[in-house]
Amino acid sequence: AGRGSRGAGATAASEGQDVSDSPATPAAGADHRCGTAAIIGRPNVGKSTLVNALVGVRLSIIGPKPQTTRHRILGIVSKPQGQILLLDTPGLHAGGARAINRQLNRAARNAVAEADVCVHLIEAGRWTDEDQLVRNVLSDSSRPRLLVLNKVDAQKDKKQLLPFLQKVGSDGFYAGVFLISARRRDGVDALERAIIEHLPPGPAQFGEDEFTDRSERFLAAELIREQLMLRLGQELPYSATVEIESFADNESGMSEIHAAIWVEREGQKAIVIGKGGEQLKAIGSAARLAMNRLFGRRVHLKLWVKVRENWSDDEAALQRFGYSE
């Protein structure tokens, strides 16, 4: 993989691209470990929140709706004892006949197949048919599996979790069971140590200050899509995607970004733009501020809304927009 993106404050020339003067990767001692960990689960159990808690930056977009995550995002966690390459997967789900649903499930299954460790994230006290689907997928992997109960802070009576734990985590299928609140970072450090312990020995693959292998161009599109998730109605965000048409730094060090928001119908276009363009303006303003924080420099963002009918069920469109692996 190419060199990863760094934290805010890195120079513009070194972010989101291959650079020959990247800092050396951390030295690997005899006990140093490095490998991939797939964060897997049904939609909306907090996978992106957990990735962000582990990496230490808001790398994966977070939203109240299922299927916020559409791409596998590699987050990099560097510790003295090891380096974790995190795969944040789309939620595995039953049903969904459109091409994009099939592609999202395929991406999640591929992450399980290539991971050194699989982290099965569920909601504390709740086991659904889709959780069982995830477990069935994990049964095809011989890699270590960790069961993680998230949102324990929402449980009023923690004692009720004991019979639940006996039911879902006591048959030896999982190498370990953890209770966490990803939102509050409760229990996250212990989970991090356990993931590293199950990784294979090896040197780090990325520098200590790199947090993702995704380019700033990709992250910019994700931040725009996050605002679509947060600001639009229940269904429309699933018919929208973002394409970065140009991304360049000017002489003053500001990034000039032009992006297209693609929807499937003219009526959806009108909703995204809003009365007098106010909705599109709000989306752009919030996304721009998020980019300023993540990239550590000023961003000038221009947005357009375009229509491509039924793009989410069009294999050629999915490939163009980066969904096909």
List PLM regions with ranges:
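Conserved C-terminal guanine-recognition region of P-loop GTPase G domains, centered on the G4
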Residues: 78-83, 103-177, 248-252
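Canonical P-loop GTPase G-domain recognition
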Residues: 144, 153-212
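Conserved G1/Walker A P-loop phosphate-binding module
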Residues: 3-106, 110-117
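Catalytic P-loop NTPase motifs of RecA-like helicase/translocase cores
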Residues: 69, 93-94, 127-128, 155-156, ...
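Conserved, well-folded catalytic cores of nucleic-acid-processing
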Residues: 57, 76, 80, 111-118, ...
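Active-site glycine-centered loops adjacent to acidic/histidine catalytic or metal-binding residues
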Residues: 88, 150, 181
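P-loop NTP-binding site
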Residues: 216-325
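Conserved glycine(s) of the Walker
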Residues: 46, 187, 279
